[in-house]
Amino acid sequence: MVCGGFACSRNALCALNVVYMLVGFLLIGVAAWGKGLGVVSSIHIIGGVIAVGVFLLLIAVAGLVGAANHHQVLLFFYMIILGLVFIFQFGISCSCLAINRNTQADVINASWSVLSNSTRHELERSFDCCGLFNLTTLRLQDDTSCSAVCKTKSSTCQMCGERFLKHSDKALKILGGVGLFFSFTEILGVWLAMRFRNQKDPRANPSAFL
């Protein structure tokens, strides 16, 4: 039997919104992990992904309520807002995947230059590295004042910039891939909501149907 009835459409829409909730939690978790590194915190894209995740959670709750109650007005705004979320999330995901290592290095350089000495030392100890890149003007000063564990074991330590790039590149690829894949499911959500909204609830009074 083809899934085209009222109950089947409602269940499909509810299931899709549960998936949206899981995606929202996933986006927030992965973005928070990348932001928690302390290096990519200045990349506004990660903050944007967190905002998309939170907003997606709210939209999923609205979709669940609208699907459960067959609420015409709520489903209408659900379709409109979900379409806007698709546009925003698609753009953010493409931006995550489009950022190359040179751009990431520029952002890391700019962020490093405005960090306080205590924050730099904390990052150096956390990542067990010294300095940022050889091209930075603060390289010699960072190397001299470095308090990482590797400094006590060897005269040379790996530069923090390389480690930062490795982690930030991984975080951006995960964010971009997950966001891009699930942004297309939002189009499916709009279609399901539109179809379900125009279906007649067999439990309702026929004269009350729009």
UniProtKB/Swiss-Prot annotation:
Belongs to the tetraspanin (TM4SF) family. Keywords: Glycoprotein, Membrane, Transmembrane, Transmembrane helix. GO terms for cellular component: membrane. It comes from the Eukaryota. InterPro entries: Tetraspanin/Peripherin, Tetraspanin_animals. It comes from Mus musculus. Residues 34-44, 94-173 are extracellular. It is a multi-pass membrane protein. The keyword DNA-binding does not apply. The keyword Transmembrane helix applies. This is Tetraspanin-31. Residues 1-12, 66-72, 195-210 are cytoplasmic. It is found in: Membrane. The chain crosses the membrane at residues 13-33, 45-65, 73-93, 174-194. Glycans are attached at residues 109, 117, 134. Its main location: membrane. It holds the Pfam family Tetraspanin.
